[in-house]
């Protein structure tokens, strides 16, 4: 039995990805978060393109920080959905455009199905992303009920005037090539912030984050709501840096690259501060939705540029 609260030491690997609960095989039709985001989008949708945002992206600083979020079951629909869920996310982010970005993530989730025993999923990931978006190294491991389930290990490299090449080590050695328009995760967040600051409402980009089996990219659609500048209600977010900082309600839908239908694999919603910190997480898997409340936040120093 997993014990809560989960204590995660600094540097313990972990992150958002398509396989957060893949071990539980729970994916389905996801539409409620997308519709909610669309309802909050100003009339006259403005859609951003990566090319139009490049100049803004290069100037966006991201705050090094460590955040912990408690997960609870917000909504469950249908016979396949769990009757109970709880968990915790620990997120470590540090670095700069000069030296690159290190991201460590752990998500521990306990699900109680309608029938059968409780299932526990424990996912870790550690990534490094070059500050200019030229390379991305990733390592992920998932345990289900204390048994190894999935391992992914590899490196992606943006080739000069060419595609993004991926060298996979696990789950099996493989070399892949994707289009030149693919973004890496931190780069993706910076483009969302650039679009928000430019007053855009929608951003559509292709993303590679090494998730699932490390061999696929996702088409993503991001809806950006009106900016909020009032303090957040949870105590963890009530720090001087965030008190009057703008944040935007953001909803990101992740689709398979093939996109044979219009139903995303899953949808992630959160409030995104202009320094990259997130609060009020909503992870929508179709049959059920998990809410993530920020329980602690620690700002970390960003080392001076070594180049």
Q: What are these regions, as identified by a protein language model?
A:
Residues 58-63, 92-101, 128-134, 241-243, ...:
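A short, structured loop/turn motif at beta-sheet edges
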Residues 139-307:
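Mature, soluble, non-transmembrane domains
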Residues 4-22:
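Bacterial N-terminal signal peptides that target proteins for export
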Residues 22-33:
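Bacterial N-terminal signal peptides
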Residues 87-94, 122-129, 156, 268-271:
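Hydrophobic/aromatic beta-strand elements that line small-molecule binding cavities or substrate pockets
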Residues 105-157:
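Hydrophobic/aromatic-rich structural module bridging two neighboring secondary-structure elements via a short loop
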Residues 68-74, 105-110, 138-143, 250-257:
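Short beta-strand segments that buttress and anchor functional surface loops
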Residues 36-100, 104-115:
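N-terminal cleavable signal peptides for secretion/export
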């Amino acid at each position: 039995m997993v014990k809560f609260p989960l204590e995660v030491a600094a540097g313990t690997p972990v992150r958002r990805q398509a396989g957060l609960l893949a071990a539980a095989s729970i994916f389905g039709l996801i539409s409620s978060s997308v519709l909610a985001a669309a309802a909050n989008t100003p009339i006259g949708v403005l859609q951003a393109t990566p090319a139009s945002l490049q100049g803004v992206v290069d100037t966006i600083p991201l705050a090094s920080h460590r955040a912990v979020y408690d997960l609870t079951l917000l909504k469950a629909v249908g016979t396949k959905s769990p009757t109970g869920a709880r968990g915790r996310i620990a997120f470590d982010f540090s670095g700069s455009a000069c030296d690159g970005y290190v991201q460590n993530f752990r998500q521990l989730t306990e699900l109680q199905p309608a029938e059968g025993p409780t299932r526990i999923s424990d996912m870790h990931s550690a990534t490094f992303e070059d500050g200019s978006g030229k390379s991305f190294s990733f390592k992920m491991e998932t345990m289900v009920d204390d048994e190894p389930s999935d391992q992914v290990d590899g490196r992606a490299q943006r080739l000069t005037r060419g595609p993004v090449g991926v060298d996979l080590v696990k789950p099996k050695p493989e070399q892949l090539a994707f289009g030149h328009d693919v973004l890496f995760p931190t780069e993706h967040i910076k483009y969302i912030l650039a679009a928000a600051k430019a007053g855009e409402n929608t951003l559509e980009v292709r993303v590679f984050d090494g998730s699932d089996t490390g061999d696929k990219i996702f088409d993503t659609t991001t809806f950006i709501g009106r900016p909020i500048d009032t303090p957040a209600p949870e105590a963890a977010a009530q720090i001087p840096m965030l008190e009057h900082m703008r944040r935007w309600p953001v909803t990101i839908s992740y689709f398979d690259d093939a996109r044979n239908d219009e139903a995303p694999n899953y949808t992630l919603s959160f409030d995104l501060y202009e320094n990259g910190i997130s609060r009020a997480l909503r992870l929508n898997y179709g049959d059920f939705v998990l809410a993530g409340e920020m329980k602690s936040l620690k700002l970390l120093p960003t080392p001076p540029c070594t180049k």
